[in-house]
């Protein structure tokens, strides 16, 4: 649905312009493209740089299965990369010399799946393997997972995010690897 954002907002601006002209209303309509929608940081950067300072109003939209004004609560969210570093080795000749970064990432993700039962019902933890290293016959020395950690309250997101961090650190200890935790973006809930 995100491919509809630009086309939809341009159509709305054209319709608004026609309506304003037909009623003799003077004003300026500006359309902004807001990058990084999925990581919720584009509008923050634009706001911090003063892009919206002289606006009387701002209207945004997002594709949905029905057309309505939303009064939804937008969740607090952390987006993080968990980057595991290990030691590469040949998987059939000397696997004992390797320390698998991919094993660490998998153990972390398994742990987080067990964690889901022990967090409030509105907490969501989504992940994807972003980079898993080398061919199957090589113990991978690098793996990266990307996480979205969300909740309707910032305090719950903070708690879940810390717990996910601890799973990552524990997985690194279990596999004798190391982990770098990279915060990509973070935002509070919006009501």
Which residues are covered by each model-predicted region?
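Histidine/acidic-residue-rich, glycine-tolerant segments that coordinate divalent metal ions
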Residues: 3-4, 16, 20-140
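Metal-dependent amide/peptide-bond hydrolase catalytic core
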Residues: 102, 106-191
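Generic structural signal marking isolated hydrophobic packing positions
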Residues: 2, 21, 180-184
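Alpha-helical transmembrane segments that form the membrane-embedded catalytic/substrate-binding core
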Residues: 5-9
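Short glycine-rich or small-residue beta-strand-to-loop segments that form or flank ligand, phosphate
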Residues: 1, 32, 148-150
């Amino acid at each position: 649905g995100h491919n509809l954002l630009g086309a939809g907002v341009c159509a709305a601006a054209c319709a608004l312009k026609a309506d304003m002209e037909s009623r003799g209303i003077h004003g300026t309509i500006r359309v902004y493209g807001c990058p990084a929608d999925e990581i919720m940081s584009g509008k923050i950067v634009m706001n911090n740089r003063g892009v919206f300072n002289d606006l009387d109003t701002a209207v945004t939209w997002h594709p949905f299965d029905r057309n309505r004004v939303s009064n939804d609560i937008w969740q607090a969210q952390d987006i993080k990369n968990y980057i595991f570093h290990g030691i590469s080795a040949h998987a059939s000749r000397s696997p004992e010399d390797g320390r698998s970064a991919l094993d660490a990432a998998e153990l972390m993700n398994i742990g987080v799946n067990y964690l889901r039962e022990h967090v409030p019902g509105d907490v969501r933890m989504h992940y994807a393997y972003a980079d898993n290293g080398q061919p199957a016959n090589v113990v991978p020395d690098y793996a990266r997972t990307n996480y979205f950690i969300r909740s309707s309250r910032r305090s719950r997101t903070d708690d879940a995010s810390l717990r996910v961090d601890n799973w990552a650190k524990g997985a690194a200890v279990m596999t004798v690897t190391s982990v770098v935790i990279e915060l990509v973006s973070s935002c509070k809930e919006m009501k």
